[in-house]
């Protein structure tokens, strides 16, 4: 898909696309909620696969929403757009035949250096998905205590050397750029061969903390089943164990849901070859029970 000319970098290659379409059990004329529309890739698939269907498209990222508006313009009034964190969305009287959430940071966000999500290019330490919020990664790094930073790195990044990194940050701050932080983290860790960049877990942890991703996910998993019609499907794609654990338990423990996937659906080797960022994707599905059954 080619997004808007204004946002050419917001390319959205939908992961697990066929599994999502089959899992949502699409029907002509159905109404679907894309809770994380991104560049519009999954929404386009839904609109193409289900004639006369409608999509309500959410994203907290204004740039993503602009790209989705452009990409989905041919579908006209079949799509309605709202800038919102999926945890805060109010469905009102609307009930959906299916809901999709594609979690975490998008490839487009990682590929926009000025957003500060990636350590691969120097940029301000921002990491806000919603530019309307005030808290940035720089503010968190420069104001949190060593104990608070260590907890963030350990619980949100599963970083073994969380305390060591946190102490080093406090000793050398203020830090304002991604390059400064990545360099400091690399120097703080013992030299050893690693399969990932030394700063990977720290950047993930800060992004999750700045955007309250896990708290938002838990709220979404609790609230979204109430937005489904009886028999409606909820599909959630996660990309790391912290997300997947919450999705697994959230679907299993909700009184209104019946889990449809004992184990998560994974991308094929062909999809991973075509889109390497799909390699860690996991799809879980559940179906809304009748209110009396729940």
UniProtKB/Swiss-Prot annotation:
One of its GO terms (biological process) is rRNA base methylation. Pfam families: Methyltransf_5. One of its GO terms (molecular function) is rRNA (cytosine-N4-)-methyltransferase activity. It catalyses: cytidine(1402) in 16S rRNA + S-adenosyl-L-methionine = N(4)-methylcytidine(1402) in 16S rRNA + S-adenosyl-L-homocysteine + H(+). The keyword rRNA processing applies. CDD domains: AdoMet_MTases. GO terms for cellular component: cytoplasm. InterPro entries: RsmH, SAM-dep_MeTrfase_MraW_recog, SAM-dependent_MTases_sf. Transmembrane segments: none annotated. It is found in: Cytoplasm. Keywords: Cytoplasm, Methyltransferase, rRNA processing, S-adenosyl-L-methionine, Transferase. Its main location: cytoplasm. It comes from the Bacteria. Gene3D superfamilies: Putative methyltransferase TM0872, insert domain, Vaccinia Virus protein VP39. Belongs to the methyltransferase superfamily. RsmH family. This is Ribosomal RNA small subunit methyltransferase H. It comes from Cyanothece sp. (strain PCC 7425 / ATCC 29141). The lineage of its organism: Bacteria, Bacillati, Cyanobacteriota, Cyanophyceae, Gomontiellales. The gene is rsmH.
């Amino acid at each position: 898909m080619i997004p808007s000319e204004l946002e050419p970098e917001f390319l959205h290659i939908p992961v697990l696309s066929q599994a999502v379409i089959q899992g949502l059990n699409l029907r002509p004329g159905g109404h679907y909620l894309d809770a994380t529309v991104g560049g519009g890739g999954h929404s386009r698939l839904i609109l193409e696969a289900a004639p006369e269907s409608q999509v309500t498209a959410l994203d907290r990222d204004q740039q993503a929403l602009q790209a989705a508006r452009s990409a989905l313009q041919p579908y006209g009034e079949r799509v309605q757009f709202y800038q919102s964190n999926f945890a805060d969305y109010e469905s009102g009287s609307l009930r959906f035949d299916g809901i999709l959430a594609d979690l975490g940071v998008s490839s487009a966000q990682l590929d926009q250096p000025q957003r500060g999500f990636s350590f691969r290019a120097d940029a301000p330490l921002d990491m806000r998905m919603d530019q309307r919020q005030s808290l940035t990664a720089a503010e968190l790094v420069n104001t949190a205590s060593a104990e608070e930073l260590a907890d963030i790195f350990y619980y949100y990044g599963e970083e073994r050397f969380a305390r060591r990194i946190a102490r080093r940050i406090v000793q050398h701050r203020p830090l304002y750029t991604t390059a400064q932080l990545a360099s400091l983290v690399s120097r703080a860790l013992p030299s050893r061969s690693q399969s990932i960049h030394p700063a990977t877990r720290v950047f993930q942890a800060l992004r999750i903390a700045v955007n309250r991703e896990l708290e938002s996910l838990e709220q979404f998993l609790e609230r979204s089943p109430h937005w489904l019609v009886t028999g409606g499907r909820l599909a959630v794609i996660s990309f790391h164990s912290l997300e997947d654990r919450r999705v697994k338990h959230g679907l299993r423990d909700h009184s209104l849901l019946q889990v449809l996937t004992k184990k998560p659906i994974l991308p094929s080797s062909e999809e991973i070859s075509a889109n390497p960022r799909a390699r860690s994707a996991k799809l879980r599905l559940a179906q809304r029970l009748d209110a009396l059954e729940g």
